Amino acid sequence: MKRFLNLMMLAVLAFGMMACGEKKLTQDDLKKAELTLMNEEGSLNMEAVPVAVEQFCKFVEQNPNDEAAPQWLFKALQVEIKAGASEKAIELCDKLVKDYPTFENNPAALVMTASEVYDSQLHDLDKARATYQKVINDYPNSDWAKNAEKMIEFVGMTPEEIFSKIVMSEMEEVEGEW
């Protein structure tokens, strides 16, 4: 009898644990999490970042074939870039491009990763150039490829150096027209 009661207790516990499984996230849950990302001053609420990004990624994990999945992965990437979480941003960009190769915002994701992560945050100029080159090679007819061609010229430069280079280039064009 005691053995039977132990087995029943184990079965009830196992059933209870299964019933307490992970909640399936909805897009409404994600929209609520997204609203927590900005504070009253309009800047990123760093305390909300881990929870929101975790929810965005969990939705993608739970619903990999949902048409909104790549958009939420892209949103997670944008948040991690803004938060300065370079390694996490790189992982998210890689996952986005690999798992959703036809997603329309992949070129934007790559350009943001090249510019904000590799160039500005990590100062890994070779990876920044390689990522821009990937955009040029993989999306040659996109506006992002045209931007990447220009951005390669500016890798490693400060905003002041970029401005100076642009002004000098425009001055040379004007002089050539005379």
Enumerate the language-model features and the residues they cover.
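Short solvent-exposed coil/turn linkers within tandem alpha-helical repeat scaffolds
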Residues: F59-A69, K98-P107, L122, I136-K150, ...
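Bacterial signal peptide processing site
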Residues: G21-K23
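Post-signal-peptide N-terminal segment of Sec-exported extracytoplasmic proteins
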Residues: Q27-K31, L35-K75
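Terminal, low-structured helical/coil segments at or just beyond the last alpha-helical repeat
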Residues: R129-A130, K134-D138, D143-W178
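Helix-turn-helix repeat elements of alpha-solenoid scaffolds
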Residues: S43-Q55, K82-D94, L122-L125
